[in-house]
């Protein structure tokens, strides 16, 4: 989508009247409807990684669901205390064949209402007299939602990109206009007797917060667990025939006060706020763009990149399952809105790299780095080892949460987290980051895995028990007595990446150590058809949502078609078996992941088909990934609709992989596009080595190919004309025109 931006041309007539116009730029990928959604998970999403808003209609009211990323109940899990809170105890129960105590401890006793992400509150405006909605549009370029009613009333709302506030500007609304602040119901009489289970907000045990009103100002204070609390405030004024409103959500963690944030915003006025808002979004969209001939794929891609910019920042907490769009239905969010490190957080950041949004990706890496101390404490306590292991399911602050122990407490989780440090280094060529963050993180992961694995008499390094998310669910046989391809690939990656980093830093002894450890690992388990098995003796002979057995192909890239016919055969056979076993028990994110793998295999048609299926079958009308097949057309037997974001962001990565790859050490443009895509272009996608690439395919021929070298160094790029590798030495800041 080609983007252009309009300058803000607001006329100031007093501070509050400075929003006479909030200029917007429509795009073909905007979300446009002639009504308001009637449920929260189909609402228009706005956010800035700190606070978020969902715009929809509940009954006769316009409803804005407000959220904040650090609204959390992080009470400790009592079941995770005691001498039996160790991996050795778990393994001993597996050895004895007595697994019920493990399920009892890590699931039944631990899966309570909290810890969990919690909702904020909602704002409601009575629109019963306003008549039908004429247009409801989310302007992606401007991160602004505009609603027009047939009677002439209108609202523009945006979540300020650089603050903890949201704005609403109404025109042509009645004198009776009012805003109500509606808090979540934390006190529901008879909740336990009603059988609401662990999903009811009432079971958190909070006192119902107090809503106070002084004129047009409404505030809400909610006490959470122990000393935690959060506040919501909204205030509005009439000015120049308009109603201008500001809301804020703050928490005791943030150290800010919602009412003060609202006061500061109103004093500044919407003109300046919107200018700063666009000061983020304009360069964000200029970071990269793609243009493909398939409108379905194009529109979904643009919507994913919009949500990515709304859900993460350099200094933000990472993207959780629902980010700043927590469920507004009176219940806890799906899977408690936590951080799932067995797939979800990792997939959510895939588009940061080729998509040229490394700063947005730093919100993830900075948080992981800041929690290293906590991970090391967990490693020592639970595994009894030095080094670094991280929980598979965790809270905002990195503490372990309940769940299936095979994946929530997997020893290789930290290796997958570590890959993101590796990717940031490779795509940024930032040697300071390598020295100060990336290598120390991977080094500690490798140190832990060196201890957690064992070397058998034949010299082979393995685990006593291994797993592969989420094969065999939470049963005892989900622990394999042989190393799975999932654990093998992650362990192999950790040692290989640590050795490469050590080499780059001139740490000869470290490099030799990690190479030795990696060299003791076996080769991948291969099935009778030549593809990757789940584990030795266990083929991928089922339909499963999590392609954990294929990690070596993508995202780890340990197996690559550029490495010769043997690896190409393994990759092709693995994908063939995935298709042969069918998608009965896939989720939406499975199709997104599949698109990335098909792209790595240079299967353009198959990659595009996976993306198209995701966009047509697994998203709600507002573009949210709903996990299940919403069309019930046989794309999955899962037809439910729990909203999670990882499928959305992995989708964006899938298209990026079709357009640009560099994992082999050689940059290749359009490596995996369908044959009928004759006119394709992209601008400023990022390759490894800190090379920024722009290219255009016209009538089936590459007519433009330019590479900007951020850091200098050796550029290797595959000529789209004759297939030879072009090698150039570049200077920092130099642009190389290939075609």
Predicted regions and their residues:
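Carbohydrate-binding surface patches
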Residues: 161-168, 689-714
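C-terminal beta-sandwich/jelly-roll accessory domains of carbohydrate-active enzymes
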Residues: 701-739
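Catalytic cores of secreted or luminal carbohydrate-active enzymes
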Residues: 108-128, 642-688, 692
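Carbohydrate-binding/catalytic loop surfaces
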Residues: 322-335, 384-404, 460-484, 531-544, ...
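Active-site core of glycosidic bond-cleaving carbohydrate-active enzymes
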Residues: 341-377, 397-399, 409-431, 436-439, ...
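Bacterial Sec-dependent N-terminal signal peptides
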Residues: 1-24
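Acidic/histidine-rich catalytic neighborhood
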Residues: 444-501
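Acidic/polar, glycine-enriched structural segments that form the non-catalytic walls/loops
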Residues: 20-41, 46-338, 357-362, 368-377, ...
